[in-house]
Amino acid sequence: MDDLKIILEFSAGAELLFGNIKRRQLFLDGHKKWTIANLLKWMHANILTERPELFLQGDTVRPGILVLINDTDWELLGELDYELQANDNVLFISTLHGG
């Protein structure tokens, strides 16, 4: 099987935790089943560059990070169990802002 191509996007400050890059195209190992849970672990190991505690809490995103998959709230799609499909767009939006 070919690589699984997905797009990651970061907005509203979430990009600051990922080297200030707002959009990434990823090619993941297509022989593996990729869920959001697996993706978050991969992101932590490979591209999360600043203060992981502001993005992750345990095995999931921390409260205050909205996750949209193809413009749909991940809560409607099974959250961590959602199985990524080719050309999925996964958007992380931070609602955590200093005052």
From Swiss-Prot:
Q: Where does the secretion signal sit in this chain? A: none
The record's listing under Gene3D superfamilies reads:
3.10.20.30
On whether Cell cycle is a keyword of this UniProt record, the answer is no
InterPro entries in the record, alphabetically? Beta-grasp_dom_sf, Mopterin_synth/thiamin_S_b, Urm1
A GO CC term assigned to this protein in UniProt: cytosol
Q: Which Gene Ontology terms describe the biological processes this protein takes part in?
A: negative regulation of JNK cascade; protein urmylation; tRNA thio-modification; tRNA wobble uridine modification
Q: Which family does it belong to?
A: Belongs to the URM1 family.
PANTHER family with a match to the protein in the record: RURM1 PROTEIN
Question: What is the name of the protein in this document?
Answer: Ubiquitin-related modifier 1 homolog
Name its species: Drosophila persimilis (Fruit fly)
